[in-house]
From Swiss-Prot:
Phosphoprotein as UniProt keyword: no
Descriptive protein name: Aminoglycoside N(3)-acetyltransferase III
Gene name for this UniProt entry: aac3-Vb
Function: Resistance to antibiotics containing the 2-deoxy-streptamine ring including gentamicin, kanamycin, tobramycin, neomycin and apramycin.
One GO term of the biological process aspect: response to antibiotic
Sequence similarity: Belongs to the antibiotic N-acetyltransferase family.
Lineage top rank: taxon: Bacteria
Transferase as UniProt keyword: yes
Catalytic activity: a 2-deoxystreptamine antibiotic + acetyl-CoA = an N(3)-acetyl-2-deoxystreptamine antibiotic + CoA + H(+)
Species for this entry: Serratia marcescens
EC code: 2.3.1.81
Pfam families, alphabetized: Antibiotic_NAT
A GO molecular function held by the record: aminoglycoside 3-N-acetyltransferase activity
């Protein structure tokens, strides 16, 4: 069985260094049994980056009404009235993005960004800088935690997670100067300072398919397509952490590659 020490050693072997800023996407099942469970994986990650390092994860929200309000869809009024507002202190994380985010959020020094559907969680010296502000309409593009993550020299870590989970490539989609990007609207229940719930409308890029060709069921989206092309260049690190095949990417490099890829393949003639 793996331990905090063995996972930390594996992370260092992969290229994680003290002081690093890491955005982690993890499959705990792929990592395999670890003494102490998921909390020990978080401890190993924190040990690997040290007290000067910062970890970030894509928490989202387990009660996000994104699909229920997408592009003008109307919820049943009773359901809408009873839907809980997003609360930084108590709202759960979306399990589809990995259970590790819940354990990151439980850290005493964790900070969480205020965009309900695109909420990020961070721990470490840069946590507040990364997570604040995070407004509706700036989910994963300019003005988002992802932009600040890239700007601060972050690295993307996949622990047994698939290549379609490289969330920072949504930032590349947002900033790439290409035509015909898909946009969506949705609503989120926000808790005001007066304790009242207000449903607020957001408009943003479509993270489920930035172009029509990437929004086809059963076909790879832009994130997976770009990540696979990037891996072929060999500018990343690969290794095994626990039992998990793992990747380490320089965020700025893969984002720059992603922007160039989109321009070359889908830019205006």
């Amino acid at each position: 069985m793996n331990t905090i020490e063995s996972i930390t050693a594996d992370l260092h072997g992969l290229g994680v260094r003290p002081g690093d800023l890491i955005m982690v996407h993890a499959s705990l099942k792929a990592v395999g049994p670890v003494e102490g469970g998921a909390a020990s994986v978080v401890s190993a990650l924190r040990a690997a980056v040290g007290s000067a390092g910062t970890l970030m994860g894509y928490a989202s929200w387990d009660r996000s009404p994104y699909e229920e309000t997408l592009n003008g869809a109307r919820m049943d009024e009773e359901l809408r009235r009873r839907w809980p507002p997003f609360d930084l202190a108590t709202s759960g994380t979306y399990p589809g993005f990995g259970l590790l985010n819940r354990f990151l959020l439980e850290a005493p020094d964790a900070r969480r960004s205020a965009h309900p559907d695109a909420s990020m969680v961070a721990v470490g010296p840069l946590a507040a800088t990364l997570t604040e502000p995070h407004r509706l309409g700036q989910a994963l593009g300019e003005g988002s935690p992802l932009e600040r993550f890239v700007g601060h020299g972050g690295k993307v870590l996949l622990l047994g997670a698939p290549l379609d989970s490289v969330t920072v490539l949504h930032y590349a989609e947002a900033i790439a100067p290409i035509p015909n990007k898909r946009r969506v609207t949705y609503e989120m229940p926000m808790l005001g300072p007066d304790g009242r719930v207000r449903w607020e409308l957001a408009e943003d890029f479509d993270s489920n398919g930035i172009l029509d060709c990437f929004a086809v069921d059963g076909k790879p989206d832009a994130v997976e397509t770009i990540a696979k092309a990037y891996v072929e260049l060999g500018r990343h690190r690969e290794g095994i952490v626990g039992r998990a095949p793992s990747y380490l990417f320089e965020a700025q490099d893969i984002v720059s590659f992603g922007v160039t890829y989109l321009e070359q393949h889908f830019g205006a003639p």
